[in-house]
Amino acid sequence: VLPPMPALERFWDASARVAQISGWLVQEIGRKDSVRTEDAYTFSLFRDCGIPIMMRKFPQYIETLAIANADTERAFTEVEESRHPTSHAVVGCLLGQSWWLPENTCQAIRHHHDFVSIRAGAGALQPAVRRLIALSQVAERIDQEMTGQNRSCEWEKMGEACLDLLELNIDDMPQLQAGATELMGKEGN
């Protein structure tokens, strides 16, 4: 169904690493807002599942990814929707619903680039949805620092709000980075 692309292997490897780190973060910083380890893992694994579908449907989507990853002002999905009739977040949410993923997971997939709602605080999204997004953003940042891959501007747009939501601060990141590096070393990744 999907064309063989070396980028997809790297994509799924990164998704798996971010999922592992997200689940570990729940254990490390504590369960809150009914978000369990397995919820964080599942969401982080599938949050970008719309990307391969967009790649298949729109031949120029690779270019869109490059533009969206480099945009410091607009939401990632806003860039996508300026070039295509939908975004990977909408496609991923629909795919998650068709797989009967929990509604909080589907909503988190739909809104995981919505930095305005993350910054807005309580009321914009359900607390569990916001927490799932925050966990995955912190995990993605840790993964990017560990691997030097998949750089984007999402941390600059959402990082501070995600740390606040998780009751962390930037000074906690080196310790989390060290713990995640140890975890991934033990996992053989």
Predicted regions and their residues:
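A short structural micro-motif
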Residues: 114-116, 183
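Acidic/His-rich, divalent-metal-binding segments that scaffold phosphate/diphosphate chemistry
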Residues: 1-90, 94-97, 103, 110, ...
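Divalent metal-dependent phosphate-bond-processing catalytic cores, especially two-metal-ion Mg2+/Mn2+ enzymes
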Residues: 46, 95-107, 124-189
